[in-house]
Amino acid sequence: MDATAVLHKTDADAHITVEDLTMAYGDFVIQHDLNFTIGRGDIFIIMGGSGCGKSTLLRHMIGLKAPARGNVLFDGISYWDTTPVEQQRIKRSFGTSFQSGAMWSSLTLAENVALPLSEYTDLAPADITEVVSLKLSLVGLSGFEEFYPSEISGGMQKRAALARAIALDPEILFFDEPSAGLDPISSRRLDDLILELRDSLGTTIVVVTHELASIFTIGDNAVFLDAETRTMIASGDPRTLRDESPDPGVRRFLNRGEI
C-alpha cells in the first residue's frame, strides 16, 4: 500500500464503501447523497428504472468519473483522495465487463483475453497462452481460442468478455447490464456463471441491471436508485425489498409482471 494512501474508518466487513456520493454533470444532479457498503464476496445489484443513473454510478465506482461530492472507498482507502500510484493499484484489482462486451473484432478470443496479460504482466508468451486457456475454460469456451467474436453467439461473446475481465484475477468484478441483448436461456447461463465465479473465487461482484430474473437469482444485496427524487430510496436483500419495502415504487419495480 502507498504510504500516502488515505484511510477512512469503515465497516470491518466492507470491501467497497460509497460515502455521501453526489453525481452531477455541471449543475445537473443525477443522484445525491448515496451511502451504502458492499461486503467482501457479495454480489451487489445496482437497480432502478431507465435513466436513473445506474451506469453513471458504476463509472464513478471504477474511477472513470470524479464525484461532485463524496467518495468511494476500497478496503477503507479513499480512491479520490489518494495518490495516482495508489489509484492505479486499486484499479488493478478490478475486472470490468461493459454492456457492449467491447471485444476487439480483429482479434481472436485468445488474443482478446491475452491483452491485459500482455499489458500488465511480465509473463512469458507460453505462460500467457496457458492462462488464457484456463480463463476461457472457466467460462465454458475451451476449444474456441481461435474463433473471432463475429463467429460466435451473443451469449458466447459475453462469456468471452468475462474471461478477459478475470484474466488478471481481480478482487472485484463490475458488470454493466450483462444480460442486455441476450435471450432468457443465455441470460440464465450467464447468471449461473457469475454465481460460480463468486463461489469458486470469492470475488466481490457489482452488477448494474434492471432484469428481475438476474436480480433475484444472483443478488445478495442491492441499492435502488430513483430517477424522480434523484437519490437511493431502498437498499438490502432484493427479495426482502420486493415483499416488504415501504416504498410503493420499489415494490412496483420488483413485482413487474406479477398478477
Positions of the model-derived regions?
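Conserved ABC ATPase "signature" region
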Residues: 77, 125-143
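Conserved ABC ATPase signature
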Residues: 148-152, 156
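A short, proline-enriched helix->beta-strand linker immediately N-terminal to the Walker B motif
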Residues: 167-171
